């Protein structure tokens, strides 16, 4: 319908829909693109992302949007990354991938699991299955604590003026957030650095993490937008991630591959994503 689009992700609202729609979706490092003007839900998590037809599309748009903004408290003052230029370059060596199933692997559909096992086999020596350390098992609960406490704060006016007009799901989320203690919130926020320290060990050996973007194909019906569980960990850690539309499920609908990079290394992730897309295309010929 359009060549480029912009979205936001607090849990999985860039990576997941890109997977369902068979397009590329790029969620940059938290703070890389300013969020000034968007409705805040959870500032430690909220991230502006982009959609495109190719890796190059997403790199082009993200490049144009990347800048320091003093109005955004999480905006990072640093050298502007050359996203498109790096994405278009060739890696000095073939990338090596860490296939991470994450603690929510059991939520993946059978065809999703089979497709990822096949991709790992195709990559051969360039892909190792890697298990994350024990603390990552609690990451989803940490994300929920942060997200709902912030939601309760930022949506307090809507709740006060018209709680009866909100959906039952939204009311429940706000009320759960209202019950969060400040000490629990602060502990949850501190977890982010602990988890990223664990990820740094992975990225010292691998160019990117390979993992599902969603549990499988898009769900039928309009009651829900799908399960974001495969995005939660990476949103919490603030790492860059990109969806590549490389697979199909049993119903012929897209299943996206999610690549995750080290915080701040967005350009390298985009270059790796472009390499993998081209590699899979060559194998499929």
Where are these regions (language model features)?
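Acyltransferase
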Residues: 83-86, 110-132, 156-161, 185, ...
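Structural helix-boundary/capping segments
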Residues: 8-103, 117-118, 122, 180, ...
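Short, surface-exposed loop/helix-turn segments at secondary-structure junctions
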Residues: 75, 142-143, 187, 213-233
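Short helix-loop capping/hinge segments that flank enzyme active sites or metal/cofactor-binding pockets
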Residues: 91-100, 142-196, 200, 245-256
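A short, small-residue-rich loop immediately preceding and capping a beta-strand
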Residues: 1-8
């Amino acid at each position: 319908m359009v060549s480029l689009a912009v979205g936001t992700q607090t849990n999985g609202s860039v990576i997941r829909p890109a997977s369902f729609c068979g397009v590329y979706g790029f969620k940059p490092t938290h703070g890389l693109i300013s969020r000034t003007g968007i409705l805040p839900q959870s500032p430690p998590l909220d991230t502006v992302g982009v959609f495109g037809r190719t890796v190059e599309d997403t790199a082009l748009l993200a490049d144009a949007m990347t800048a320091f903004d003093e109005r955004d408290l999480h905006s990072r003052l640093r050298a502007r990354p050359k996203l498109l230029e790096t994405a278009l370059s060739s890696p000095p060596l073939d990338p090596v991938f860490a296939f991470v199933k994450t603690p929510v692997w059991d939520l993946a559909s059978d065809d999703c699991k089979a497709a990822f096992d096949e991709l790992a086999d195709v990559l051969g020596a360039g892909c190792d299955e890697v298990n994350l350390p024990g603390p990552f098992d609690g990451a989803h609960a940490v994300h929920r604590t942060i997200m709902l406490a912030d939601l309760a704060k930022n949506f307090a006016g809507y709740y006060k003026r018209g709680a009866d007009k909100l959906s039952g799901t939204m009311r429940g989320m706000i009320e759960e957030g209202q019950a969060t203690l400040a000490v629990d919130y602060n502990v949850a926020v501190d977890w982010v650095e602990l988890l990223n320290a664990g990820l740094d060990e992975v990225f010292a050996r691998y160019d990117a993490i390979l993992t599902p973007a969603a549990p499988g194909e898009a769900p039928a019906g309009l009651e829900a937008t799908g399960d974001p569980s495969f995005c939660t960990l990476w949103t919490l850690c603030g790492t860059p991630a990109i969806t590549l539309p490389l697979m199909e499920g049993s119903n012929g609908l897209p299943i996206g591959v999610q690549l995750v990079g080290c915080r701040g290394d967005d350009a390298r992730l985009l270059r790796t994503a472009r390499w993998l897309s081209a590699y899979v295309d060559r194998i499929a010929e």
